């Protein structure tokens, strides 16, 4: 009895043949390096010496791709495909090859037998392409190597793209990760009146690498209840018989795309309600259409299908016969013509032009990227008449600037701010004068700044903030992510993956540049005295510094005017990760805007107004990077100037940390000549650094004067205490810095000892005072820089 459904017998035959073609090409990529159409008996030399790749998920991915092609053609839909199980890379490559996109981008992989051989040979092969849905894969914005981020990327791409449908395959293994588990809640932030739609396709093929998956072992009733609780309407497509499954999938997609159209048509622009978005739960065998058994062991529909089901095809004649029979079961002569090209009636199933999934510009976001309309950051400048004379909250000033960035780009709708419930805490609350927080869930009368059309994305999940922003950037828009410094570590690995993506994408001419990922790390280690040790960790910049020099940028603006310059600069860059570390508490303001511009453009500079060298070679260099280290350095200089009035002191402040490297190591690096001019070749350098001291040593270790660098920073000492005590615990305070300077100078014991004793006594007084009064001493709280220019 023929399978019932919307497909005519001819349509059913065609879509099944197309699926067979994708499966054939997928198997060929894993196994073959010659004889791509099996026009001669399979020989050992036709098979790759190292078999790499993942078959188990791939036939399911190919099945979905074929049916998305049908719905795109039928409804003129605008669809991109996010492949959560990115290890099914052979399928994504195969499908973009079948639709013609792959050969357009890579002409050497031509649509003939020779091109097919090159397609097969290159996969997971030296000099070829990776095994996953990497940047080299047309249509991909998600590599899917590290699992957990598919669905959050899908939602990020859908925001502000009202005509886009993001089909997102979530593997049942990936569904067990924490990031994916919370991603289901993204539907509470998707506004049907202005955003696109996300179609989650939960692919339950039953197994991970060597274990069953949790969700695959739940009943349909439990799954239905689970996802209805999340706010979805699940549609089940289950089975293993191809004809029946094709009809079920076609009928389900027909229903779902109509449902999406109705949701968007009925959405009230002014007060949209949260709909129950559809999703698919697809149950199909792992390794579907592959060998049932190998060596008497079950393969299809079991974990053994996960990677390479038949492992010894070169050496083992029986295994080679299994592979040959498997590939011939797809009947390549029914799929490809004499030249090796896909037959015309099958090629007609693929969409045309930019409607093809592999050619959709939303998956090559740089094609759609528009520069932000930017206000003049100088308009927000703090009026600094004398260094340190006034205080300001630097991030609050930046918030005013970001508010107006938001206003100027309201028409384009291509800028959002992201944060884990910290926008107000991080003193960026001014942005809420221009927009609201996105919220599609229940709203109470007492709630403020919640709206369906808001442009501030706040949810208490750093994973969602990072993933939404990545999806938003990869599809051609701009964003800004503010976070407590210690808790940005939650997304360390997500940052790693994005940086790797950018590094590869930069080398692909066809991938156009996307906007940079911009972090503001605040509520930082030196001002987390009230929350304690758990909130004190400046190590994210160490991770960033490990990445490619073409990608990584780290900035430590010491005051509001430098922060404005850095913020403006970062929002104008592309294909980078910019990390800005700045405090939110009131702090001294050092530079005029003109001075700040000059200082930031150079990346570092000598603060002549703070030093006493008078054009001569200094006796000592006091260097600093970070707002609190800068203040403590200047306070130490104040002590030294009072105690040793004839001492020649140079003060160097570093904003762009990467200038410390050489130009051979980093494009921002300064020359050895400039470095020596700044830091001397033989004088002691006392360097007060915001983070872990060893990073500075690492950055400058090849410099002439490295042996004279004495770096102080966070040495993993923390608790709930006073702000100044945090610096004392880590020996970054003014007294320790001044003592270090005295000890490194050839002063003689008669001069040095009384000074060191005095500074040591001050530290003892500090310790007693805070334990008695619960706050820092007045001379610390009220200290100001008073030396005239």
From Swiss-Prot:
GO BP: any one term: carbohydrate metabolic process
Pfam families, A to Z: XFP (PF03894), XFP_C (PF09363), XFP_N (PF09364)
Highest taxon of source: Bacteria
Keyword Lyase: yes
Keywords: Lyase, Thiamine pyrophosphate
Its EC number(s): 4.1.2.-
Residues forming coiled coils: none
GO molecular function, one term: aldehyde-lyase activity
Cofactors named for this entry: thiamine diphosphate
PROSITE patterns assigned to the protein according to its UniProt record, in alphabetical order: PHOSPHOKETOLASE_1 (PS60002), PHOSPHOKETOLASE_2 (PS60003)
Top EC category: lyase
NCBIfam families (UniProt xref): PRK05261.1-1, PRK05261.1-2, PRK05261.1-4, PRK05261.1-6
HAMAP family from the UniProt entry: Phosphoketolase
Family: Belongs to the XFP family.
Name this protein carries in UniProt: Probable phosphoketolase
Organism: Brucella abortus (strain 2308)
